[in-house]
Amino acid sequence: MLEYHQGPVIGLHPMFGPKVESFSEQKFVVCPGRNDETFEWLLNWIRILGGNIIVCTPEEHDRLMVFVQATQHFSRFSLGAFVAEEEVDLNRSLLLSTPNYQQEIDIVKRLFAQNPQLCVEIMLATEERCQAIARLASTYNRLAQLVAQKDRFGLIQEFEKAQEFISNFRF
């Protein structure tokens, strides 16, 4: 945008879908561009309506959206496609399910309530997203190979490695 428009520029990415009816507690990622003070009225308005402003560079935004959006969409898209291929009776499975399964199916259901063009665009928007999805698929394949080999030790090692990484974060 900066090279195509000489005036004020700001990157604004609402982190919610079109069905949200209120800005309250919703996140807006803001990437400063040029003459940022020009947009202070807009950011203040979002804050007044209860929105949360998170500032980052465009580079950080793009790098993290690979994981926040693209790989998550692919993972849930894959699970939805698998459930459809397997013709799982979702109503019956939900009767027999854990709370975690219910939450996951709810998330998958929300994904498939969206516009398919938007979902696909989110996954294919950049080469970095496509490459990350390929790496995720490679991880799935590597772990599936351990399952196929009934390699308990290998699976536990993979679990503990991920567990150690994730446990270092305080949410």
Segments the model singles out, each with a brief description of its role:
Residues 55-171:
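An accessory alpha-helical subdomain
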Residues 1-52:
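Rossmann-fold dinucleotide-binding core
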